C-alpha cells in the first residue's frame, strides 16, 4: 500500500509543478467575453451586465478576427460596434494585437495568455479597462 501512496504523492507534485506555458498551438482558438469592466472617476461599469459582447479568434497563422459591441458607448450615447481584424503575436505569456485600421483598447493594451484565457488590464487617460476572454 505504501508504494502506491508514494507514487500518487510524486504524481501530484509533478502535476502541480507543470505550469502552463503559452505557445501558438495552445493559445490558438475562439475566445468569448467573460468579464469586461471600465473604471473611472464616476465609478465602475460592468459591460457584460449592460449587454456588451466581444469575441476574438486567434488563427495559427497569426491572423485574428472578432467583434466588439458596447451598448451606449458610442458617440452621443449610440451603441459602439466594430469588427476586430488584424494580426496577433505571442511573446512569453503576452499577446499583442496589430489592428492598424481599428482604434480600440484591444490593440492598445497587452493581453496575458493563461490556460484557456486571455486577460487585459490597462489604464488609458484615467480609465481602467479590465477584460477576460475564455475559450
Locations of regions flagged by a protein language model:
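N-terminal cationic leader/targeting segments used for protein routing and processing
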Residues: 3, 26-27, 94, 117
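Sec-dependent bacterial lipoprotein signal peptides
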Residues: 1-15
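Short acidic, glycine-rich loop/turn motifs
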Residues: 37-40, 68-74, 99-101, 122-124
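Short, solvent-exposed loop/hinge segments that bridge or flank secondary-structure elements
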Residues: 28-62, 97-106, 130-131
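N-terminal glycine/threonine-rich, aromatic-flanked beta-hairpin/loop signature
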Residues: 45-94, 124
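N-terminal helix-cap/turn-to-beta initiation motif at the start of protein domains
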Residues: 17-32
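Beta-sheet ligand-binding and adhesion/scaffold domains
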Residues: 94-135
Amino acid at each position: 500500500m505504501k508504494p502506491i501512496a508514494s507514487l500518487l504523492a510524486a504524481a501530484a507534485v509533478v502535476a502541480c509543478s507543470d505550469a502552463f506555458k503559452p505557445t501558438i498551438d495552445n493559445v490558438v482558438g475562439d475566445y468569448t467575453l467573460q468579464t469586461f469592466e471600465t473604471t473611472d472617476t464616476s465609478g465602475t461599469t460592468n459591460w457584460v451586465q449592460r449587454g456588451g459582447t466581444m469575441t476574438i479568434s486567434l488563427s495559427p497563422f497569426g491572423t485574428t478576427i472578432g467583434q466588439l459591441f458596447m451598448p451606449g458607448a458610442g458617440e452621443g450615447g449610440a451603441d459602439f460596434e466594430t469588427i476586430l481584424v488584424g494580426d496577433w503575436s505571442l511573446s512569453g505569456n503576452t499577446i499583442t494585437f496589430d489592428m492598424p485600421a481599428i482604434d480600440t483598447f484591444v490593440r492598445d493594451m497587452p493581453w496575458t495568455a493563461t490556460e484557456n484565457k486571455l486577460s487585459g488590464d490597462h489604464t488609458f487617460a484615467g480609465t481602467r479597462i479590465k477584460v477576460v476572454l475564455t475559450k
